[in-house]
Swiss-Prot record:
Its EC number is 2.7.7.78. Its main location: cytoplasm. It is found in: Cytoplasm. The keyword Zinc does not apply. One of its GO terms (biological process) is glucose metabolic process. GO terms for molecular function: GDP-D-glucose phosphorylase activity; guanyl-nucleotide exchange factor activity; hydrolase activity; nucleotide binding. Specific and highly efficient GDP-D-glucose phosphorylase regulating the levels of GDP-D-glucose in cells. The lineage of its organism: Eukaryota, Metazoa, Chordata, Craniata, Vertebrata. It catalyses: GDP-alpha-D-glucose + phosphate = alpha-D-glucose 1-phosphate + GDP + H(+). This is GDP-D-glucose phosphorylase 1.
């Protein structure tokens, strides 16, 4: 991934001497609501490469320059080069990537037994990360529009990256928040997508039981220079006011929330999504969530029509720990159509049918899925007019 050097990138770089890292403090990335780009970000025609995208935003330049420096300094568990990538033949459009190192060297998952498990300070958490792993602190200026004051969020490298720019969005670690989605964390994730001028910067969340490996509140963010099926997949409304839709198309059925406007509409979306995830968590239903630029709800459309932001929520069977022997584990990116594969043999032999079979194993039984659907429809219907 070719990243231009930003003129002010030194603000987010570590000092030359390692001894100075801890004393440097965490730089703030300050932004305003006007910098959130709802329109004008599209996939380029032709090759799906960053070389053909519009100039990267201030956010992209800050993140990528700081992330690249940490890679050069050896703060990751392995160096990440260009990953072998293929689009699987078939109707879905799965993007498979070979990432052997992540499959071997990622941190072992914690002993999780419940979607509602409390934070345990004795387990690994983000208060224990090394100096230098934090890139910057996201800080939104408060404006006069009456929007909710956004809490500060740390942007931290994922030391076992699945793709370029793979970071974690972490609310103040000292609060000891368990892995349960909160509005402030989701807002930061959606706004990070809107701060990026790259159409392939995505954000996601894995619940406990949805393959979250650390029980300390965090979201994932990363770049993938490929379109994904969920960007333009068709949907059907579940609510007459268009507040909740269902994606029936492959890779997996899920619930779609969409907005094309910042401000109150975005706040309403965040509230709806978190009410839905609260319901799932309270009912011990594991779930995954994916945030991407995408098309409005409705009929299938060209995935180049990125006119707003899509938040897709998938309730799923709980899965605690990593399954060995599978080509990939099903979490936020796999449900969206991005398949990080663990071995060269699986990468060369993987088919669309095999990928769909692995994903289907993680979906709720039909009767339970229908119950969840009815509950979420009722939840949205109770929203204040």
């Amino acid at each position: 991934m070719a990243i231009p050097h930003a003129s002010n990138e030194t603000s987010y770089l570590l000092p030359p001497n390692k001894e100075d890292w801890e004393g440097q403090g965490i730089p703030d990335f300050v932004y305003e609501q006007e910098e959130l780009m709802m329109e004008g970000v599209q996939w380029p025609r032709g090759a799906l490469s960053l070389l053909n995208t519009p100039p990267l935003s201030h956010f992209d330049s800050a993140l990528c320059s700081a992330w690249r420096q940490r890679m050069e300094l050896g703060l990751f568990r392995y160096p990440l080069g260009e990953l072998p990538t293929q689009t699987l033949p078939g109707t879905v459009g799965f993007v498979a990537q070979l990432n052997v190192e992540r499959g071997v060297q990622r941190r072992c998952p914690q002993n999780i037994k419940s979607v509602r498990q409390e934070f345990d300070p004795e387990q690994f958490n983000f208060n224990q990360i090394r100096p230098g792993e934090v890139l910057f602190r996201l800080h939104r200026k408060q404006d006069c529009s009456g929007t909710v004051q956004q809490e500060d969020i740390l942007v931290v490298i994922n030391v076992s990256p699945l793709e370029w720019g793979h970071v974690l969005l972490v609310p103040e670690p000292a609060r000891g928040l368990p892995q349960r989605l909160l509005p402030g964390a989701l807002r930061a994730g959606v706004e990070a997508v809107l701060l990026s001028s790259h159409p392939g910067f995505r954000v996601g969340f894995n619940s406990l039981g949805g393959l979250a490996s650390v029980n300390h509140l965090h979201l994932h963010g990363y770049y993938l220079a490929h379109r994904l099926p969920v960007e333009g997949a068709p949907s059907e409304p579940l609510d007459p006011r268009g507040r909740l839709h269902v994606l029936q198309a492959l890779p997996a059925p899920g619930f779609l929330f969409y907005t094309s406007r910042p401000g109150p509409d975005l706040e309403a979306l965040i509230s709806r999504v978190c009410r839905a995830t609260d319901y799932l968590t309270d009912c011990e239903i594991a779930h995954n969530l994916f945030v991407t630029r995408g098309a409005p709800p409705g009929k299938a459309t060209s995935s180049s029509a990125l006119s707003g932001v899509r938040v897709i929520l998938w309730p799923r069977k709980p899965s605690f720990g990593i399954k060995e022997g599978e080509a990939f584990n099903v979490a936020l990116c796999e449900l969206a159509g991005h398949l990080p594969v663990k071995t060269a043999q699986d990468f060369s032999s993987l088919t669309e049918a095999a990928a769909l079979a692995l994903i289907r194993e993680c979906l709720l039984p039909p009767a339970q899925a229908e119950d969840v659907r009815a509950a979420l429809v009722a939840l949205i219907a109770r929203e204040e007019e």
